[in-house]
């Protein structure tokens, strides 16, 4: 079973935005979650550190990190987890939260037809996610 890990992160003690951590008191529940649950640690913005990686390692949870639409953030998150993930870091799960039709159109068009910056970036992040899934993190 997989669970999103954000509800087990103390949102008042991390550099993440309010959506990436619990600010309603659910974070202590991490002590009650069975250790055979795979946590999905999602962060979509660039940070200098990702303390949830350290937290999940310290608490003995296997976890994957999850990115979305910012290539620099995806790469920084992967680099951090690769350096700090000791025994429990299991890989990368790419998320996609909308805009699938324009993104797919971008991926099949030639470069002369690719105009919209946001769609281009979004598609490139998906391409990066697919590449990582195919060849691995190294």
Where are the predicted features?
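Substrate-binding groove of N-acetylhexosamine-processing glycoside hydrolases
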Residues: 1-138
């Amino acid at each position: 079973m997989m669970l999103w890990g954000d509800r087990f992160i103390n949102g008042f003690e991390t550099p993440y935005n309010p959506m990436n951590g619990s600010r309603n008191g659910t974070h202590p529940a991490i002590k009650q979650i069975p250790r055979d649950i795979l946590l999905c640690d999602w962060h979509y913005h660039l940070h200098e550190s990702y303390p949830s990686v350290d937290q999940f390692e310290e608490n003995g949870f296997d976890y994957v990190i999850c990115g979305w639409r910012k290539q620099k953030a995806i790469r920084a998150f992967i680099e951090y987890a690769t350096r700090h993930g000791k025994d429990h870091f299991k890989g990368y799960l790419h998320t996609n939260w909308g805009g699938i039709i324009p993104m797919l159109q971008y991926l099949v068009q030639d470069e002369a037809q690719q105009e919209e910056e946001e769609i281009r970036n979004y598609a490139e992040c998906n391409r990066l996610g697919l590449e990582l899934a195919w060849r691995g993190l190294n």
